[in-house]
Amino acid sequence: MSTPFWQSKSLEHMTEEEWESLCDGCGKCCLHKLMDEDTDEIYYTNVACSWLNSKTCSCKDYPNRFTSGEECTKLTREDIDDFTWLPHTCAYRLLAENQPLPEWHPLITGSKSAMHAAGESVRNKVVYEIDVVDWEDHIQNLPDRLKPHN
């Protein structure tokens, strides 16, 4: 059996198809983040982009996400050094930090079911930006399993 591509290739050398398949579809990228102006610390909220389908954890207009979702961030190979803002469970970040993919990752399990069962997606855990008055009320504390591994 051959070595999985994510273990044998650097992020820079992956094909577009391989790159896209790294995304586990958790939906955490689609949550709004707030930055502390004094410390530059990033805080995750449970406030989702209006384009996120909270049941499937995917964009309602994925092919056009960079034009229809003006705040949607495109992850590129050129930005690898800046991936520290990504969730600590994100494959792009993990591989950039030379860490293994989590055991529930769809590339390992073959489906998103294990990710949802492990509670690693935003499925049914979000509110939409249109319904939010005070965004700071929606800051989420990261559980220990999502904190940086040192």
From Swiss-Prot:
Q: Which domain of life is it from?
A: Bacteria
Span of the secretion signal? Answer: none
Its family remark reads: Belongs to the UPF0260 family.
Protein's name in the database: UPF0260 protein VIBHAR_03078
